[in-house]
Amino acid sequence: MKNNIIPFILLLFLQVFVLNKVLFFNYVIISPLVMILLLYKYQKDSKETLVVSFFLGLLFDVFNDSLGLYSLTCVLVAYFRNLWVLKIIGEERTEELNLLSVHALGGFQFFIYAFPIIIMFYSILSLFEFGEYLSLNNLIFIFLSSISNYVLIIIFQYLFLNNNNISNEWR
């Protein structure tokens, strides 16, 4: 955690003060909140992950004035993330990994782990924020926001999380 606290604060700052409700090209929302949820340390049957994701979402709800939308989204994503990690990575491998990153998992396995979670985040956000899910505009929003955030997550990991930081916890 010692080496990863600065990138974590940078992501919080970006989400709250810079990228707060910024819409790119009328379809893309960049949300570093997804990156925080993805890179958080996995612990089997951990209530800590749910509590941290709730308060993280609550922090963004305060700044977005969104009445619990981000809290609900973060808790649902954190809950299904724990199930997805066991399904994709396996229980024996998760015990030896401190950080679920591209460096630790490899490119393809990280894509299989991260991209469905990112899609789920934007699907839940879109469903509750816009009120409709299967319109063409919402599907384009979900798809383009997911792709842009995945690219941002990969770039962030290669810039700020090098191989030396893998042994440290992201908590």
How should each PLM-predicted stretch be described?
Residues 1-171:
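Terminal, non-globular segments
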